[in-house]
Structures are given as C-alpha cells and as structure tokens.
Amino acid sequence: DTSQGGRSRLEWVYSSIPNGGPDLVVIEFGGNDVLRGFEPKITQKNIEAMVMFLKNKKTKVLLTGMQSPPNMGSNYAQEFNAIYPNLAQKHNIPFYPFFLEGVGGVPSLNQKDGIHPNEEGVKVIVNKIGPYVVDLLFGK
C-alpha cells in the first residue's frame, strides 16, 4: 500500500484495537510510493502524520526505512532516502534503517515479482528487526 493509504486508515485501525490501542506500531511505508514515483515530500508528509498521530496517543513507534531504487535517479534517491532518518531524528523515535535489509535484490528471498519477500525473505526480516521490536516492548 502507499503511505497515503496507511495514513487514511490509521485512525480507524487504531480505534478498532481493544484496550486503547497497540503498545507499539512499526511504520513501514514508502516502498510503493517510490515505485509509483510519488514526490518524496508527499511520502514524508504522510509518514510524519502517522508518527505524530501515534505519539499523541502515547504509542511507541518504530520507523523503518525504505530505499529508492537507482533507476529513480540520484536526486530523487537522495531526497527519498533522507525521509526516514530525518523523521526519526526530528521526532526522537527509534529507527531501523532499511526494512528489506538482506532481502532486497536477493532473488531467492523474493516472490516472482522481485519486489515482495517470500516466506524465507520474511524470516530474514523478522530475524533482523525482531530484536528492535522486543527491546521496544520489553526493554533490555
């Protein structure tokens, strides 16, 4: 989905979770935005709105980054790739630099579309990001 789709559903999804909402939300948006050539400023605006909504609800947030493929051009990639670390710093939230670390571009870990992780790819992602999630939920 796009960051706009996530933003438009966040309040509804949040309110449907019992006991006042989730303890932690992992924000992982932007991949479809970049593939559709959305302006990075639009993606940033949508993700920042989600971060602010969750912070206002006192919900822990883990922001995960995406990266622009090289075919989008260096200027686009530079602007897009900066969204995530900039927002994490601005809002003082934990940041996992690249959601698809170790999976992106590895054919054996992706579905036939070459973009979305397959079952083995998901295992790699969970093993890499899992410690961040556990630490945020339960501390070290």
Feature-to-residue mapping (PLM):
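Alpha-helical cap/lid subdomain in secreted, periplasmic
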Residues: 8-140
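Short beta->alpha junction loops
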Residues: 1-3
